[in-house]
């Protein structure tokens, strides 16, 4: 972290604004800073033990007004008016409801108009704002960094600490700049950008860092695209990801339920405009990517860094000289049941999943609908389209997108995390292969024995139509209707 009166990065500015008590000592022996938390997001999976800890200690929630809960990970995306069938999932959801009632926390339960994936409803409600600190017991809290917030996932013991004190002891992070300059080619999305970034720096490349995404290509993205970028910072090993707020940010936030109003809005925007990295500020690490060189990107392996352009082929481990890396590639190919040299476009899929906190927003659904309009999903492919929130679903319905999905043969579901992870009924069967707009392709992530290829919404939709990994450019035939 920069010292006082020196140029500072965006992350350093937000950090220093939230230090309650500075840690003593120097270097590795330095004690953590105590950081104030502006927004605490809660869901059913990582919170039960935290509330139990409060109960045992006789403590209240310090700031219930800065805490908001929703049900997302374990909820079904069909028959939401019926009891949850799985007993573990049902218990977690019921426990969250009891805890929120007991401790006075606002909850958006399954079926509520504001219910949805926690990282989608925060920005949707205007709760996520520039210059704030945001935490949640979930890895992909980094999503909120798209607004210039310092947002990070925390463990269950830390969830309890924030509930009890509204603070968190943290050691300062290193800083990394990922500069993406130039103009993105047609058909290249934010998802392709972040998959290319992770392939370049590796899944451990950002370890211990807060990544700030910069450059003209980043500035050209919508807020939804920026959220996709920041969402997957954790897949690069980073603690958080951030993008400096600008007019795009302000336009997205203006008028949302929890955004400042009137004179308060004007004052907030003036303050938010200062949330930029100072000229001359030093990053610990810098990465440069030419936007014009990017193309649709897909993963072939079992971690998000094992990816290539869609135009490439499955890598050959015999061409890798590092023994450890070669062994990892061989293991991934065996699990994925892929042969080296196979063109990525020739890989067939059994399922396509559109959704998650990475790509479950209205902009993503519009892209998918544009590809599916007048076309049909391949006969041997099952396609699930799952909105990230009930608000997103309602907007999609109002725009006629739901009709496009169902006419094409896709399943149009209710809001939830769905097939992103195997914690609810939406799962792959062993051996099934899925093109997924989610963020993780670990072994068994979408169900035991399932095989996952991470893709953008456009690639997901084209893949559903052709039955093999594809981009919309591969759909040469005109729509049939």
UniProtKB/Swiss-Prot annotation:
Q: In which pathway does it act?
A: Amino-acid biosynthesis; L-leucine biosynthesis; L-leucine from 3-methyl-2-oxobutanoate: step 2/4
InterPro entries in alphabetical order: 3-IsopropMal_deHydase_lsu (IPR004430), Acnase/IPM_dHydase_lsu_aba_1/3 (IPR015931), Acoase/IPM_deHydtase_lsu_aba (IPR001030), Aconitase_4Fe-4S_BS (IPR018136), Aconitase_4Fe-4S_dom (IPR036008), IPM_dehydratase_rel_enz (IPR050067), IPMI_cat (IPR033941)
Q: Which reaction does it catalyse?
A: (2R,3S)-3-isopropylmalate = (2S)-2-isopropylmalate
The record's EC number reads: 4.2.1.33
What is known about what this protein does? Catalyzes the isomerization between 2-isopropylmalate and 3-isopropylmalate, via the formation of 2-isopropylmaleate.
Subunit annotation: Heterodimer of LeuC and LeuD.
- State what protein this is by name: 3-isopropylmalate dehydratase large subunit
Give the species. Answer: Mycolicibacterium gilvum (strain PYR-GCK)
Instruction: List the top taxonomic levels of the source.
Output: Bacteria, Bacillati, Actinomycetota, Actinomycetes, Mycobacteriales
